Amino acid sequence: MTRSTRLYADDAEMYRLFETELFVAVVGDVMDTLGLRHQFLPPVFKPVDEKTRLLGRAMPVLEADIFPSDEATRNPLMTKPFGLMFEALDDLKPGEIYVASGASPRYALWGELMSTRAKILGARGALVDGFARDTDGIKALGFPCFCTGYYARDQGVRGKVIDYRCALEIGGVRIEPGTLLFGDKEGVLVIPRQAKQEVVRLALEKVRGEKLVAKAIREGMSAVDAYRTFGIM
């Protein structure tokens, strides 16, 4: 795509297009047509607040379970509370999404204070492959958080962050630092960097075409004729 035909100049313009015109279902549809048929995260991921959507670039965070004992450890990270969690949180950049995975579902990976810090740093949300807690506080902040459920149990003595800004896989979908994520209450998509421009272009064409289809159906056109005419349904 040449510079003159680009749909947006930067992330801010791209986010505006997503926020004003696009939704997950239509983006998923066009990704299917491009052969990107395995980019949805598992359907267990839901927003803490259904009014919020997830949109930004991934900052992956690797979690691991721990099982404390009285024996000496050979790993200095084991003596550090929460491992590298605070460093990972403080390293968030504007426009990024904190994406945590690797832990078993025994404790919460995200909460209100983490949301507060992330919001101050300009992050656009959190996606944790596990539980969130302090959900009323997260809702009050208006901070987008997607998780697999709610559980108040703390990770302090049960898990640690062992790395960040590293590639992850969630549900068989690879997420690298900087990968674009788009989510709403109907699902979360991982949009590969090399396909992003084409995905946005086709999604805009489809969503604008769907408005024409809806108008035709309201005016009496049958579903068969609508699909034959527009190729959209």
Give the role of each language-model region.
Residues 28, 38-39, 57-60, 96-99, ...:
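Structural motif
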Residues 66, 103, 130-133, 150-151, ...:
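Short, ordered loop/turn segments at secondary-structure junctions
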Residues 120, 124-152:
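Ligand/cofactor pocket segment of small-molecule handling proteins
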